Amino acid sequence: MSFRIGHGYDVHKFTSAKQNIIIGGVEIAYHLGLEAHSDGDVLIHALCDAILGALGLGDIGKHFLDTDNQFKNIDSKFFLAEIKKMLDKKQYSISNIDCTIIAQAPKMLPHIEKMRACLANILEIQISQINIKATTTERLGFIGREEGIATHVVCLLYR
């Protein structure tokens, strides 16, 4: 059996030009949005990078350029579905995924189960294979000042 580990990280700053945020494919009511070329889903972006990294295929920016207008305001679930096809083509399967959302606000706990279900559905895996947790920075740094949100994701693949 062959194993591969990937790590992904993403961060987006808040903008008053949008309302509500999308994280893990779930829309969360909030007075600000996340600045991005796509929908700004920091969790899906980090997850894409983790899978691509484990496959040795670079990062999300290599496959979906942020200068390409076809990806302007696109639902990030599209990226994850395309990366799932790459995963299948390389004949790897997901063992597990572990995600950490770092945000002072809004609170993530009420939305985590919906995120897990959404991601499991796209990746065609069991919800039990995805863990999502959230933390704050205890009001330190740009996240603590509520200027943005970051995520880290680790995935383990096997074949």
From Swiss-Prot:
Record's keyword annotation contains Metal-binding: yes
Role: Involved in the biosynthesis of isopentenyl diphosphate (IPP) and dimethylallyl diphosphate (DMAPP), two major building blocks of isoprenoid compounds. Catalyzes the conversion of 4-diphosphocytidyl-2-C-methyl-D-erythritol 2-phosphate (CDP-ME2P) to 2-C-methyl-D-erythritol 2,4-cyclodiphosphate (ME-CPP) with a corresponding release of cytidine 5-monophosphate (CMP).
Single GO MF annotation: 2-C-methyl-D-erythritol 2,4-cyclodiphosphate synthase activity
UniProt keyword terms in alphabetical order: Isoprene biosynthesis, Lyase, Metal-binding
UniProt superkingdom: Bacteria
Site (Transition state stabilizer) residue list: H37, T136
Assigned protein family: Belongs to the IspF family.
Pathway recorded for this protein: Isoprenoid biosynthesis; isopentenyl diphosphate biosynthesis via DXP pathway; isopentenyl diphosphate from 1-deoxy-D-xylulose 5-phosphate: step 4/6
Source species of the chain: Francisella tularensis subsp. tularensis (strain SCHU S4 / Schu 4)
Name used for this protein in its record: 2-C-methyl-D-erythritol 2,4-cyclodiphosphate synthase
Transmembrane portions of the chain: none
Subunit (UniProt): Homotrimer.
Phylogenetic classification of the source organism: Bacteria, Pseudomonadati, Pseudomonadota, Gammaproteobacteria, Thiotrichales
Claim: Cell membrane is one of the keywords in the record: no
Binding positions for a divalent metal cation per the UniProt entry: D10, H12, H45
Cofactor, free-text remark: Binds 1 divalent metal cation per subunit.
Enzyme class: lyase
InterPro entries, per database record: MECDP_synthase, MECDP_synthase_CS, MECDP_synthase_sf
Reaction catalysis annotation: 4-CDP-2-C-methyl-D-erythritol 2-phosphate = 2-C-methyl-D-erythritol 2,4-cyclic diphosphate + CMP
Cofactor field: a divalent metal cation
Classification via SUPFAM superfamilies: IpsF-like
GO biological process, one term: terpenoid biosynthetic process
Pfam families assigned to the protein according to its UniProt record, in alphabetical order: YgbB
